[in-house]
């Protein structure tokens, strides 16, 4: 099974000049979804926690955590979780965004795998690393379903954490 066959290119979405990688067909096929989760999970076996960000990261992170029987921790947009949270603001090409992590969910010095759907420029992943450093967790590795290699080169060249992907474009 070729997982790339289940990722659809959508031209000019969400705006002209963009080629959007639609993972909906991959998620809608039980065998393709099962395979990508198992492939991603191979890289997460040695971590104490699986951490993923709103929203599509949750799809992969929760499934991997369930598959490996490990705790799953959500990184969310502001004001979506109760209680004290670590917060990080980061820049996007069209503005900025904020991510939060509840303070009491990850034990100090625990090892963590960060999981996401697609790696483009790495802004979200950098913010997640910063949040986990605030929580005094050890980022063991990063695992993404899809790596857009032309867009991710700068991020990967400055990254000190191992990064693995299942599908590369």
Curated annotation (Swiss-Prot):
Its main location: cytoplasm. Pathway: Purine metabolism; AMP biosynthesis via salvage pathway; AMP from adenine: step 1/1. One of its GO terms (biological process) is AMP salvage. Transmembrane segments: none annotated. It catalyses: AMP + diphosphate = 5-phospho-alpha-D-ribose 1-diphosphate + adenine. Keywords: Cytoplasm, Glycosyltransferase, Purine salvage, Transferase. This is Adenine phosphoribosyltransferase. It comes from Mycoplasmopsis synoviae (strain 53) (Mycoplasma synoviae).
